[in-house]
UniProtKB/Swiss-Prot annotation:
Organism whose genome encodes this protein: Aeromonas hydrophila subsp. hydrophila (strain ATCC 7966 / DSM 30187 / BCRC 13018 / CCUG 14551 / JCM 1027 / KCTC 2358 / NCIMB 9240 / NCTC 8049)
Recorded family membership: Belongs to the LpxC family.
Pathway involvement of the protein, from the record: Glycolipid biosynthesis; lipid IV(A) biosynthesis; lipid IV(A) from (3R)-3-hydroxytetradecanoyl-[acyl-carrier-protein] and UDP-N-acetyl-alpha-D-glucosamine: step 2/6
Annotated InterPro entries: Ribosomal_Su5_D2-typ_SF, UDP-acyl_GlcNac_deAcase, UDP-acyl_GlcNac_deAcase_C, UDP-acyl_N-AcGlcN_deAcase_N
Assigned EC number: 3.5.1.108
UniProt-listed GO biological process terms: lipid A biosynthetic process
The gene coding this protein: lpxC
General function of this protein: Catalyzes the hydrolysis of UDP-3-O-myristoyl-N-acetylglucosamine to form UDP-3-O-myristoylglucosamine and acetate, the committed step in lipid A biosynthesis.
Protein name per UniProt: UDP-3-O-acyl-N-acetylglucosamine deacetylase
Species lineage: Bacteria, Pseudomonadati, Pseudomonadota, Gammaproteobacteria, Aeromonadales
Length: 307
């Protein structure tokens, strides 16, 4: 049987919010079975809980943000959400003392390090998966994203199309058979990226105030400005894949199926997930409880070495 997972104990980290520029202290705490991922704003009195689910995503401007009916938010959750998906974490309390998750280095890797540092505990309940039964497609102009049935795991195929000298001749398509190992080694270190020409406008809108060469890949009109260059030759499309993994984990369960997308982003990823969940005949919840049952997605174990 493949079981639900949480952490063995609590762990804390401090960083800066990518868009707010504010210092953030974040604490991960183990949660009971069937809790899901729950974000808590501990700077508010009383503390406000925001469960991670697709319907709570009410802002997708340059990030994924959970926002409740009162307007309380936790923003920029996508990189952490991707790390939780990659590590197969089902149940967790995420406490933050600010409206945003810290950006760390702009990738999911520091979150994975924190999760591995304290260790993962299996719980006495079967892990649930969302298995795709029917194809679903959403579009926005020339952009599109879709799910298809696929019983052998979670297969992802994502393509971007940026018209910029740095992207010319560079692979802008990424295909992934999702697993804990493939995520950690091939995707998790890909950083968020942005263009110098956009930064002044973004900051005038109180966005990207915490962005820097320490937590993002920055491009001018011709080149990458980071002295150390790229972590992967195709880091840009891999970061978009990372974002999609995080956005699609807003159902609190790993997906068994195929995801294909062209020029997708946070809004379209969320639109696709909502469209799927709204069509009950298009998916089913499955578990692998038999003694010999093997789930089609393999997750981190203590033998996995960080990339």
């Amino acid at each position: 049987m493949i079981r639900q997972r949480t952490l063995k104990t609590s762990v804390q980290a401090t960083g800066v919010g990518l868009h707010s520029g504010r210092k953030v202290t974040m604490t991960f705490r183990p949660a009971p079975v069937n809790t899901g991922i729950v974000y808590l704003r501990t700077d508010l009195n009383p503390v406000v809980e925001l469960p991670a689910n697709a319907d709570q995503v009410r802002d997708t401007v340059l990030c994924t943000a959970l926002v409740n009916e009162a307007g309380v938010r936790v923003s920029t959750i996508e990189h952490l959400s991707a790390a939780l998906a990659g590590m197969g974490i089902d149940n967790l309390y995420v406490e933050v003392d600010a409206p945003e998750i810290p950006v760390m280095d702009g990738s999911a890797h520091p979150f994975i390090y924190l999760l591995q540092e304290v260790g993962i505990r299996e719980q006495n309940a079967p892990k649930q998966f969302v298995r795709i039964k029917q194809s679903i497609r959403v579009e926005d102009g020339d952009k599109w994203a879709e799910f298809h049935p696929y019983r052998n795991g979670f297969k992802m195929d994502l393509e971007i199309d940026f018209q910029h000298p740095v992207f010319e001749g560079r692979n802008q398509r990424c295909v992934l058979d999702f697993s804990g190992a493939s995520f950690v080694k091939e995707i998790s270190r890909a950083r968020t990226f942005g263009f110098m020409r956009d930064i002044e406008y973004l900051r005038s809108q109180n966005l990207a105030l915490g962005g820097s060469l320490e937590n993002a890949v920055v491009l001018d009109d011709y080149r990458v400005l980071n002295e150390d260059g790229l972590r992967y030759e195709d880091e840009f499309v891999k970061h978009k894949m990372l974002d999609a993994i995080g956005d699609l984990y807003m159902c609190n369960r790993s997906i068994i199926g195929e995801f294909r997308a062209y020029k997708t982003g946070h809004a379209l990823n969320n639109k696709l997930l909502r469209a799927l969940l709204a069509k009950q005949e298009a998916w089913e919840l499955v578990t692998f409880e038999g003694e010999g049952d093997k789930a089609p997605i393999a997750y981190y174990d203590n033998g996995l070495v960080l990339a």
